[in-house]
């Protein structure tokens, strides 16, 4: 059963704030002024959206759609992390002015994990929350009932895991993935958080905060921390959140493996779509993202590290992520005539390289966007070459 309701909001007057995949590379972006201020710290609003409750094999999913699917183009489908919902995880990014040019070309589908949406009722006693694999198995029903043929996914943390699992199971439905703070491994993050933070209690809100933010952020960025602590504690049903966290804690390893030419490229379990991995350089997820990077095809994967940025780059640095996403989408052949972002126009770039014929082809579109930038030809076993971008 597919139920929908349409909610239309007035347009916001305030600003609410890359590239084709190539050889494995590590891009570092320096910090610009964070978006979050006292004026708009809780910029979680939806604008011009339709809400849908969609039946799937593992229960009902709450989905919010912005815009209408454009012909045969994919939709941008998002999936949030634990302790968040689509509003708190993605609306700062999608309400940012530089993203508006992108969303003119694509409909956006925000998926809330079961029971995590704003105002969600508690689950009945004895309810079994879907496993992470089952959460991925719910997504084909969303695409089918919204008459969507394919998607470009943006996932954060647990949501990045779900979208990766979905892409592994349904490669023809996924044209590209932006994976923020993705962890491909099976070990539980709760034990990790407890081991890293002495003196902290087992309070779920505290553990969620340790999952999202570095110790420096927890100390130094009080406005951001207070905003999200209140959100986790007050806006998300705590019983439902505990179930989602339990599902994420007991996830399976994704089982992905880097393909080796002439050995296993036809049989290895890995993503076949372009992937952009994103992590702040002080994020608790850095090691996990680097591990994921080491398992993916370097000719289709880019690792982007945001300098001086912590656990929520899409919230703290939406301008940087909007720019990166624009280049990513253009690299897949969409929006070829779109202009540079304001950030790109003010950028200076530097790097060094020797480029092979194959790697030239794989990154030619990217280099045309990052003017004056050349990238290194990297062996599968070599560490990533760093390309520093200042602005």
Predicted regions mapped to residue ranges:
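Conserved HGGG/HGGXW glycine-rich cap/lid loop of the alpha/beta-hydrolase fold
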Residues: 57-122
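Conserved acidic catalytic loop of the alpha/beta-hydrolase fold
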Residues: 132-152
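Flexible "cap/lid" loop of the alpha/beta hydrolase fold
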Residues: 161-205
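Conserved serine/cysteine hydrolase catalytic core
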Residues: 237-305, 349, 355, 363, ...
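Histidine-bearing beta->alpha loop at or near hydrolase active sites
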Residues: 306-313, 318-319, 343
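Post-His helix in hydrolase/transferase enzymes
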Residues: 314-330, 335-336
């Amino acid at each position: 059963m597919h139920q929908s309701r349409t909610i239309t909001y007035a347009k916001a007057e305030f600003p609410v704030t890359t590239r084709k995949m190539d050889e494995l590379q590590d891009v570092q972006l320096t910090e610009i002024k964070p978006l979050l201020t006292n004026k708009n710290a809780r910029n979680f609003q939806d604008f011009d959206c339709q809400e849908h409750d969609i039946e799937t094999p593992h229960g009902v999913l709450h989905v919010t759609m912005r815009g209408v699917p454009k012909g045969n183009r994919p939709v941008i489908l998002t999936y949030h992390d634990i302790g968040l919902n689509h509003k708190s995880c993605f609306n700062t990014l999608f309400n940012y002015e530089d993203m508006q040019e992108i969303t003119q070309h694509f409909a956006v589908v925000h998926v809330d994990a079961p029971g995590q949406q704003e105002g969600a009722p508690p689950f009945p006693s004895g309810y079994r929350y879907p496993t992470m694999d089952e959460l991925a198995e719910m997504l084909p029903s969303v695409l089918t009932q919204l008459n969507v043929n394919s998607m470009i996914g943006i996932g954060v943390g647990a949501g990045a895991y779900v979208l990766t699992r979905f892409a592994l199971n349904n490669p023809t439905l996924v044209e590209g993935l932006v994976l923020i703070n993705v962890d491909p491994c099976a070990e539980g993050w709760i034990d990790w958080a407890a081991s890293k933070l002495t003196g902290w209690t087992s309070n779920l809100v505290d553990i969620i905060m340790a999952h999202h933010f570095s110790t420096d952020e927890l100390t130094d960025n009080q406005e951001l921390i207070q905003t999200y602590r209140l959100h986790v504690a007050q806006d998300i049903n705590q019983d439902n959140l505990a179930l989602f966290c339990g599902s994420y804690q007991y996830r399976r390893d994704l089982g992905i493996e880097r393909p080796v030419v002439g050995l296993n490229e036809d049989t290895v379990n890995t993503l076949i779509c372009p992937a952009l991995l994103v992590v702040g350089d002080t994020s608790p997820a850095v090691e996990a993202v680097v591990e994921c990077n080491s398992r993916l095809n370097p000719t289709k994967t880019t690792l982007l590290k945001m300098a001086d940025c912590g656990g929520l780059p899409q919230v703290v640095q939406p301008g940087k992520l909007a720019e990166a996403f624009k280049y990513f989408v253009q690299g897949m052949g969409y929006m070829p005539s779109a202009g540079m972002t304001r950030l790109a126009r003010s950028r200076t770039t530097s790097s060094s390289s020797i480029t092979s014929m194959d790697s030239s082809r794989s990154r030619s579109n990217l280099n045309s966007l990052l003017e004056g930038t050349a990238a290194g030809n990297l062996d599968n076993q070599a560490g990533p070459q760093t390309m520093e971008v200042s602005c």
